[in-house]
């Protein structure tokens, strides 16, 4: 299932690189979704801006997917992927619904859901980054990245899909809890710390 997702994403992304009309037809766009083209909520996840964007998303997906596949199996893996994909774009839609020109592509929501599901299942998993070679527990990264995404979404000073990351992350967390409710007891504090920034962000917005 993982390699099928990767293959489809690569093939469709390459098609989008070469064919601008294809790219524009299937990318996420607020006005188009409002006009009934709901398929863009899904199709946009298989398109990417360039090879760097494509590589980063798929590399991240590869790093975190096996943990979920081994722990939960292929069916639950695809459920997490698809639900996170949709809600990453849905969260983006709600965030930018008054900006009809807003467009986005990429599997960021789906990948983010997989990443945060893996973090919830394996919070002590060590992560090593090129610019930060010291092994870091995944839960530290998870909390930090949510805070960074909320900050980035508020600042609106880059081209990163922070809202898709956030929507995908919260979806991945919730679906993982539904699939494996015992995690509420074993990871109570981690769940609280991961969800708290969303609650604060909603409260500040109001």
Please report, for each region that a protein language model flagged, where it lies by residue.
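A detector for small-residue-rich transmembrane helices and their helix-helix packing motifs
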Residues: 1-206
């Amino acid at each position: 299932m993982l390699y099928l997702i990767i293959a489809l994403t690569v093939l469709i992304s390459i098609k989008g690189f070469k064919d601008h009309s294809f790219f524009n037809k299937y990318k996420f766009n607020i006005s188009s979704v409002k006009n009934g083209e709901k398929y863009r909520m899904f199709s946009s996840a298989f398109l990417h801006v360039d090879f760097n964007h494509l590589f980063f998303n798929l590399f991240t997906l590869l790093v975190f997917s096996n943990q979920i596949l081994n722990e939960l199996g292929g069916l639950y893996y695809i459920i997490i992927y698809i639900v996170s994909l949709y809600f990453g774009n849905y969260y983006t839609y709600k965030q930018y619904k008054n900006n009809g020109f807003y467009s986005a592509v990429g599997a960021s929501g789906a990948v983010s859901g997989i990443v945060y599901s893996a973090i919830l299942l394996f919070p002590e998993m060590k992560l090593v980054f090129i610019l930060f070679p010291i092994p870091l527990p995944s839960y530290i990264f998870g909390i930090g990245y949510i805070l960074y995404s909320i900050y980035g979404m508020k600042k609106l000073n880059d081209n990163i899909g922070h809202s898709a990351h956030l929507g995908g992350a919260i979806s991945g967390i919730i679906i993982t809890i539904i699939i494996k409710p015992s995690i509420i007891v074993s990871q109570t504090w981690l769940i609280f710390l991961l969800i708290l920034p969303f609650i604060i962000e909603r409260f500040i917005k109001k």
